[in-house]
């Protein structure tokens, strides 16, 4: 593993912690892709493949309308605490 001084670029993921993440349209790919279990699986895989950090989408309210884009989300502080408990070395913002 490289030291922090040797690293030139940190790679991270924007996590799917809100409903309807892939698209603002009415098309639904997978309804439950924003669950904690799904986020934990992504976090563990990201850590295993050497990603440096995870970054949540922070929304308190959705956009309303037919899709209520990002209308339901995992609260970010609790989300971060749970993922920090589940992982060993990846940074969680």
Ranges and model annotations:
Residues 1-89:
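N-terminal beta1-alpha1-beta2 module of alpha/beta enzyme domains
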Residues 92-93:
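Conserved strand-turn element in the central/C-terminal portion of the radical SAM core barrel
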């Amino acid at each position: 593993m490289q030291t922090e001084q040797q690293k030139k670029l940190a790679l991270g993921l924007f996590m799917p912690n809100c409903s309807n993440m892939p698209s603002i349209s009415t098309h639904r790919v997978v309804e439950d892709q924003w669950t904690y279990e799904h986020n934990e699986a992504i976090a563990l895989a990201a850590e295993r493949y050497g990603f440096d950090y995870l970054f949540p989408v922070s929304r308190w309210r959705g956009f309303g309308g037919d899709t209520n884009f990002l209308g339901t989300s995992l609260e970010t502080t609790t989300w971060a605490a749970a993922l920090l408990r589940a992982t060993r070395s990846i940074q969680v913002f």
